[in-house]
From Swiss-Prot:
Protein source organism: Bos taurus (Bovine)
Name listed for the protein in its UniProt record: Hippocampus abundant transcript-like protein 1
Gene3D superfamilies: MFS general substrate transporter like domains
Cytoplasmic-side positions: 68-79, 130-131, 187-193, 270-278, 338, 406-425
Keywords (A to Z) from UniProt: Membrane, Transmembrane, Transmembrane helix, Transport
Mode of membrane association: Multi-pass membrane protein
Stretch list, region Disordered: 1-27
Extracellular face of the membrane: 1-46, 101-108, 153-165, 215-248, 300-316, 360-384, 447-502
CDD domains reported in the protein's UniProt record: MFS_MFSD14
One Gene Ontology molecular-function label: transmembrane transporter activity
Length: 502
């Protein structure tokens, strides 16, 4: 195989570090795959995330009711199992979908993940059993964040990504500011059927936006030269992806940090609203107001504060600060027995939301420009594993401590009385604080920035493959992504058509 001409190499180097405006020009010949409104930008990704989670936020109150009506016994436990199955399926599929988006582009997988994630929404009123079954199965495609973060990496320079990831995460929080309150109001005034209808319409709007307005962000030259490809299932195996993590100490530390920090967060997210309503005595309005408060503060934390912290403290110290706040708020929830304590801990929880965008920036810095989907897919896969284990773990701990959803009325005098006498009112949250403490200890050993871990090749795919015979040399090879190919071209190499490995 011949090395690519200097002109093409220079062009590809410019492509790897260009701003979205410059990228758009080089992709002008992309054809129909670039259909969309304007140039690819962070705003497209933010709108997709906002609409998807706004639709689900509308169902917050209704879902609590349907969950209790469908599983009147062991509600916490069943909630944990449902979310657990969904999370495990997400773990299995995230590396594959992230890697496929590196091959075929981001837009088709944005469309697929949003469609299948929102597919269960109308089933809530049609058949609750099918609704919860489809929620579990939809975990196969519930990896929108993986593709979104890869999309953002495509359209931003490296030094811009922490801010961009912060905006995307803040958009997620913004989608939950008003949607639960709107859903609670519509449910109380017009019934759950209207809430489900509105959520379905919002989900359809999101799908139409992706289909008609979102342009493709991945350059054509970063994709395979032939469609005659077959899947190498060994490389598509999520456990194989996790094995690659161990080849790079920096990525290994990051992944362990993500696992230990997100495991309690996933459990908390799956059960906290039930906990507020059952144990603390929050009504639907208070729950919606609580979500709005935390959402607004999270937006401020992930935009204004995150940017300032990244500049003043650095990436690693920002992650450590976020983990410290997360540990504090979980311990507060664990020992808290009064409503005001929940509100105060919610403020701390909002500040701790800076952790994930800061970690995503660390991952992006240690991944090659044409492997952002794979790298973010691995992190999303780990989060998916936590989404499976966390809810099940919290549900089991609630079950062991005999905390059950026996009533949905806000006035829970007997439960509150029992809560007052409990030494640890929220055992799962205190357990989560201990896990986050271990995550903090691991994160201490993460280097601020490691260029030696995964080489930052600015040349294009074809150019890097031209040097494939030299991989046996003593030079450093990117340890995480060197075996991340999931595609093997079935066509023989011909003059002018070299085998492409991603």
């Amino acid at each position: 195989m011949n090395a690519e001409p200097p002109e093409e190499k220079a062009a590809s180097e410019a492509e790897a570090g260009a701003m979205p405006e410059k990228r758009a020009g080089s992709r002008a010949a992309g054809g129909n795959s670039l259909q969309g409104f304007g140039r690819p930008s962070v705003y497209h990704a933010a709108i997709v995330i906002f609409l998807e989670f706004f639709a689900w936020g509308l169902l917050t109150t209704s879902m609590l009711t349907v969950l209790h009506e469908t599983f009147p016994q062991h509600t916490f436990l069943m909630n944990g199992l449902i979310q657990g199955v969904k999370g495990l399926l997400s773990f299995l599929s995230a590396p594959l979908i992230g890697a496929l988006s590196d091959v075929w582009g981001r837009k088709p997988f944005l469309l697929g993940t949003v469609f299948f994630t929102c597919f269960p929404i109308p089933l809530m009123r049609i058949s609750p059993w099918w609704y919860f079954a489809m929620i579990s199965i939809s975990g196969v495609f519930s990896v929108t964040f993986s593709v979104i973060f890869a999309y953002v990496a495509d359209v931003t320079q490296e030094h811009e990504r922490s801010t961009a990831y912060g905006w995307v995460s803040a958009t997620f929080a913004a989608s939950l500011v008003s949607s639960p309150a709107i859903g609670a109001y519509l449910s109380a005034s017009y019934g759950d059927s209207l809430v489900v209808l509105v959520a379905t319409v919002v989900a359809l709007l999101d799908i139409c936006f992706i289909l008609l307005a979102v342009p493709e962000s991945l350059p054509e030259k970063m994709r395979p030269l032939s469609w005659g490809a077959r899947i190498s299932w060994k490389q598509a195996d999520p456990f194989a992806s996790l094995k690659k993590v161990g080849k790079d100490s920096t990525i290994l530390l990051i992944c362990i940090t993500v696992f230990l920090s997100y495991l309690p967060e996933a459990g908390q997210y799956s059960s906290f609203f039930l906990y507020l309503r059952q144990v603390i005595g929050f009504g639907s309005i208070k729950i919606a107001a609580f979500i709005a408060m935390v959402g607004i503060l999270s937006i401020v934390a992930q935009t204004v504060f995150l940017t300032s912290l990244m500049r003043s403290l650095g990436n690693k110290n920002t992650v450590l600060l976020g983990l410290g706040f997360q540990m504090f708020q979980l311990a507060w929830y664990g020992f808290g027995s009064q409503a005001w304590m929940m509100w105060a801990a919610g403020i701390v929880a909002a500040v701790s939301s800076i952790t994930f965008p800061a970690v995503s920036t660390l991952v992006s810095q240690n991944a090659d420009s044409n492997q952002q989907g794979v790298a973010q897919g691995i992190i999303t896969g780990i989060r998916g594993l936590c989404n499976g284990l966390g809810p099940a773990l919290y549900g089991f701990i609630f079950y062991m401590f005999h905390v059950e959803l026996t009533e949905l009325e806000p006035e829970l005098i007997s439960n509150n009385a029992a809560l007052q006498g409990a030494v640890i009112p929220g055992p799962p949250f205190l357990f989560g604080a201990c896990i986050v403490f271990m995550s903090f200890l691991v994160a201490v050993f993460i280097p601020e920035y490691s260029k030696g871990g995964i080489q930052k090749h600015s040349n294009s795919i074809s150019g890097s493959l031209a040097n494939t015979p030299e991989r046996g040399s003593d030079e450093d090879i990117e340890p995480l992504l060197q075996d991340s190919s999931i595609w093997e071209l079935s066509s023989l190499e011909e003059p002018g058509h070299q085998c492409t490995e991603l």
